[in-house]
Amino acid sequence: MKYFDWNVGKNEELRIERGITFEEIIFSLLHGGLLDTIEHPNRKKYPDQKVLIVNVEDYAYLVPFVEAEEYIFLKTIIPSRRMTKKYLGGIKDET
């Protein structure tokens, strides 16, 4: 089984700026949160990347990654309204 890896500094930056971490993504993946895996939309600029679409607390996040022989390197985490609507039917009302 491959393991997940990421940049520790980037993880802290994501925690501060976006309120989410790679650990939360991994937790969601291990508990059935994977919605899809797609090719990176910009294949010319990122030919070796794919994108995980992950459900975290009823919101879809895009997680670009590079797959090596022994590990999967997570690049960043991008919240996506468009993918939330496509895969989860929109943002859930908290009332």
Predicted regions and their residues:
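Ribonuclease/tRNase effector modules and their secretory precursors
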Residues: 1-95
